[in-house]
Amino acid sequence: FCDGPTHQSRRWQLVYGVRGSYGFNLTVYGPNRPLHSGHYGNWSPNPIAMLTELIGSMRATDGRILVDGYHEQVKPLSDAELAAIAASPRMDEVLITDLGIGAPETEDRLELAIARPAMNLRGISGGDVGAKARNAIQPSASASIGLRLVPAQTPEYLREVIENHIRKQGYHIIRAEPTTEQRQQHERLARVNWSSSGGYPAYRASFDNPLAMQISTILGDLSDGTLIQTPTMGGSLPLYVVEDVLKTPILILPVANHDNNQHGADENLRRMLETHSDLLTADLWLFCDGPAHQSRRWQLVYGVRGSYGFNLTVYGPNRPLHSGHYGNWSPNPIAMLTELIGSMR
């Protein structure tokens, strides 16, 4: 697969796996309407404070996930995978400067950090801030939480242990807005809604697979021995589906520039465009595009049709006219256009 950002060193890179993905929206509740924080503060539950405490019970400041049993399924990196990481250039200090951060969350290098399970806070909402801030206790607060899975972890298991953790913090889990009865029966309510897609597991090919070894040798020669081999990419792709069908290892060749602001408002594809421009100078162009043959058999296509087009506009009066007063007298552009098209086709 050709996907994802290249290594920050800009050297050729072969990636053997990706993390899985799952996510959920979490909402906790306080009073059934906004309350004045002076009149009711220190008495009424504050959903924003409750939410931050609940998140803090699940995720440490160094990124470690604190949920009991969360790492039970984790398959550790092999000696060969750890050696490949150790052999790759360490870019942490360069990234710290480039990204303008004081320090990373963890003392581990980036490649080790992204090989672990992750709990990412995608967004959080409650009251307003800045000029719109009010001295009020809000009725609810919400967070969107994304999970990155590593090999052997399953979405179903993680859902179970996370919900068990939330219950241990004293919350009753609901799936919709709370009813009056639920508010009266439970001191703490947490609405948990998991992504409708159901998530998907991680995938990682083995370093000692014969096909993987062959490809790494070829790319190593092409890169003059500077190829970086990475056990897993930090991002996610449902590659397990492809592997289940084809029964063959899946490898990833990153093509985008590492500083492409991926998933940001100004994401760009500079490195990908450079890579494709290099491909256009080759003697053989191979494009993966279009629908497969209707028989579902493998197909090699030797050509495509060309394409051209034009916009055609015809004109009538310089302003709209009443069709009763001017019909059958004024030229009608719609009729004229259909006649002209009919003369061509």
Model-based region annotation:
Residues 1-104, 108-117, 266-345:
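Fold-level recognition of mixed alpha/beta catalytic cores in primary-metabolism enzymes, strongest
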Residues 70-140, 148-164, 169, 174-271:
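An extended, acidic, His-containing surface patch that forms the Zn2+-binding/catalytic region
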Residues 145:
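Active-site helix-to-loop segments that bind/position phosphate- or nucleotide-bearing substrates
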